[in-house]
Amino acid sequence: MLRGVFVTGTDTGVGKTVVSAALLHRFRGTPGIRYWKPVQTGIEADDDTAEVLRLAGAASAQALREGVRLPRPLSPHLSASLAGTSISLPPLMDLAWAQPDGDRWIVEGAGGVLVPLNDRELMVDLISVLGLPAVIAARSGLGTINHTLLTIEALRARAIPIAGVVMVGARNPDNRVAIETRGHVPVIGELPRLEPFTPEALQQAAEGIARGGELDALLGG
């Protein structure tokens, strides 16, 4: 059984990879801290695993190879269909259960929680069977309250614990308060949009991830 967190998002392109890299760097002192992207679409143009390792300043041994690698940057079910294949949960679970018990994992999803993996299952079903609490990557700006609260509802409908929300973009105190009070979840970090998109910028921004409490229990040494 994996220990750690599953980084999901309120949408695609909200900053899941940046949040994953920030967590990997923030908890770099934890023995056995590792990263895994179970499903990667658009592999010819986007390699999130390589990007997380680059930004976090982590070694290649700290990442597990993707369980599914698909060429087109589309929803996982559609990218798989166009590649003449399909995504099945059991092989992903076999890969997860084969990992050492003592490791701590930052697992990154693709898209949002209700993106389809196949004709029957959604990304949230993968989160559920992995048994990991979710960290939600959310935009900081207009529209994020609705998107984040919907994501929280979808996770809670499946009894998936939520470790917290990380907001990405310019600080917006009003949106932060609305998400915390109406969603009953902590905002555990606020990260700026990285400019430039460098390891130095990411590693400085990673200090915006709060240490302590549940997150330390999940990812700390």
Locate predicted features.
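Short internal beta-strands
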Residues: 37, 135-138, 163-169
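N-terminal phosphate/diphosphate-binding loop that engages ATP/GTP or pyrophosphate donors
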Residues: 2, 18-86, 90, 94-98
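C-terminal lobe/tail of nucleotide-utilizing enzymes
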Residues: 152-221
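Glycine-rich phosphate-binding P-loop
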Residues: 6-21
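Short, structured coil segments at secondary-structure junctions
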Residues: 56, 130, 182-185
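Inter-motif core of Ras-like GTPase G domains
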Residues: 118-141
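Switch II (G3) loop of P-loop NTPases
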Residues: 91-118
